[in-house]
């Protein structure tokens, strides 16, 4: 058995070509695709989360897709444990794990280890969520800035998940999230060698892809998907209820927005999210091969790079 076993990591913005690349690489390398997108973990949101199709999932093994009910939350620590189990299973089966997704925190937690942050007690979490429902994300961000200006400065005022997380940790521990993130990390898993790719398409093409994909989602049944989600009567603060497109289409179903306005708003939210992802991957993932997956020459070079490197260490 070799001292290290290969794991491919593919990150980048939404609509940036990650899933197609992962499928191609898994086919070329006898691989198993492992999901690292926090929203594609949820069951019942195949269309709106751009999860691979049933036909695509049948081409090569896919793991950690649609495994969590929308009524639950998923932490980076829990995902990491599940991902490591799937990576080990893939290696034991003689396959190459291809971990793909736009949730950068998941990818970093896997490759570099996870900050040892104390768990947030449920009463503190519930209080924070109630405050968020009362104030909204920008106002909660302002409160965070008053107590943790450095941490708030690193967060977009509209990033609900990260603002709420920072507020919960501050309330639960009395220390900013940044303190725990720099206090030390759990060690990265031994015996693995990570090859990291970051998809970086040009922004104009990326934003056009975001807009076009949302229109395809509507044609593929996104509205019906959200109608089924709404029928579950879930807490609107749950992560699944804040997936891209869900709040806007819920507003349309309530009669608050015409479909055209809901579509435009969701497209703008998707472009904003893609922009934040581009920035995050550029500054937070250092050791990566970055490329434009829409450039055939670059894509072919990356495919060869992966095949050559996996061959060397498998």
Swiss-Prot record:
Q: Where is this site: Interaction with substrate tRNA?
A: 103, 125
Q: State where substrate binds.
A: 14-19
So which cofactors does this thing need? Mg(2+)
For this UniProt entry, which segments traverse the membrane? none
Annotated stretches, region: Interaction with substrate tRNA: 37-40
Q: Which top-level enzyme class is recorded in the Swiss-Prot or TrEMBL entry? A: transferase
Care to name a GO molecular-function term for this sequence?
A: ATP binding
Enzyme nomenclature, EC number = 2.5.1.75
One Pfam annotation reads: IPPT
Residues binding ATP, per UniProt: 12-19
Catalytic reaction annotation: adenosine(37) in tRNA + dimethylallyl diphosphate = N(6)-dimethylallyladenosine(37) in tRNA + diphosphate
Top-level division of the source organism's lineage: Bacteria
Which keywords belong to this entry?
ATP-binding, Magnesium, Nucleotide-binding, Transferase, tRNA processing
Q: Which Gene3D superfamilies match?
A: 1.10.20.140, P-loop containing nucleotide triphosphate hydrolases
Briefly state the protein's biological role: Catalyzes the transfer of a dimethylallyl group onto the adenine at position 37 in tRNAs that read codons beginning with uridine, leading to the formation of N6-(dimethylallyl)adenosine (i(6)A).
Q: What is this protein called?
A: tRNA dimethylallyltransferase
Question: Which organism is this protein's natural source?
Answer: Rhodospirillum centenum (strain ATCC 51521 / SW)
Originating gene: miaA
């Amino acid at each position: 058995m070799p001292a290290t076993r290969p794991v491919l990591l593919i990150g980048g913005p939404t609509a940036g070509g990650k899933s197609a690349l992962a499928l191609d690489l898994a086919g070329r390398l006898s691989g198993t695709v492992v999901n690292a997108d926090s929203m594609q973990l949820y069951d019942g949101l195949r269309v709106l989360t751009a999860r691979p199709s049933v036909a695509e999932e049948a081409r090569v093994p896919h793991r950690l897709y649609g495994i969590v009910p929308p009524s639950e939350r998923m932490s980076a620590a829990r995902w990491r444990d599940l991902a490591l189990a799937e990576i080990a299973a893939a290696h034991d089966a003689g396959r190459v794990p291809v971990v793909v997704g736009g949730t950068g925190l998941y990818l970093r937690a896997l490759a570099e280890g996870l900050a040892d942050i104390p768990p947030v007690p449920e009463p503190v979490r519930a209080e924070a969520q109630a405050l968020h429902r009362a104030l909204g994300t920008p106002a909660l961000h302002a409160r965070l800035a008053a107590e943790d200006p450095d941490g708030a400065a690193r967060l977009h005022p509209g990033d609900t998940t990260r603002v709420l997380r920072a507020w919960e940790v501050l309330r639960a521990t009395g220390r900013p999230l940044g303190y725990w993130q720099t206090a030390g990390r759990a060690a990265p898993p031994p015996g693995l060698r990570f090859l990291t790719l970051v998809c970086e398409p040009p922004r104009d093409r990326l934003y056009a892809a975001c807009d076009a994909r949302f229109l395809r989602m509507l044609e593929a049944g996104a509205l019906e998907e959200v109608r089924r989600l709404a029928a579950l009567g879930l807490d609107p603060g749950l992560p699944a209820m804040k997936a891209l497109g869900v709040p806007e289409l819920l507003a349309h179903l309530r009669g608050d927005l015409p479909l055209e306005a809901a579509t435009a708003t969701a497209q703008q939210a998707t472009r904003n999210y893609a922009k934040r992802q581009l920035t995050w991957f550029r500054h937070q993932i250092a050791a990566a091969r970055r490329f434009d997956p829409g450039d055939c020459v670059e894509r072919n070079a990356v495919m060869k790079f992966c095949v050559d490197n996996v061959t060397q260490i498998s």
